[in-house]
Amino acid sequence: MKIYVDADACPVVSIVERVAQEMKIPVTLLCDTNHILNSTYSDIKIIGAGADAVDFALINLCHRGDVVVTQDYGVAAMALGKGAYAIHQSGKLYENDNIDRMLMERHIAKKARRASSKNHMKGPRKRTSEDDERFEAAFRRLIMRGKV
């Protein structure tokens, strides 16, 4: 098992690294040239800037049984297709029985935004320590499930 993180603006990198180091699981952080990452534990792969370049690089690296941390539903769907596990930074697991619905909801929301004359969107709410705890608990459960 290896862990791959879509690390562009990912708020859970430090949690992933801490848990992975504790469990002796290798981590690869992938980001584009617009981000600077430093790590004493993880392998860092900087991918040339370009639409979805990091996403495709991550999918090319992952294999069955690996864990992918991403907030991108498309990346999660491709990871599941390769037999990898996928988890959102919120702690929500992407699974074969929920990914189609999530992709459809994303599509509908995108169409609604395009059709609306009001294009202002509120950003996500501020991340809390409870969010981090929820992610860590789900991440640990996922790793244990993958090790069985």
Swiss-Prot record:
The protein, known as: UPF0178 protein CA_C2825
Pfam families in the record: DUF188 (PF02639)
Annotated family: Belongs to the UPF0178 family.
Residues of the signal peptide: none
NCBIfam families the UniProt entry points to: PRK00124.1
Membrane-spanning ranges: none
Domain of life the protein comes from: Bacteria
InterPro entries (alphabetical): UPF0178 (IPR003791)
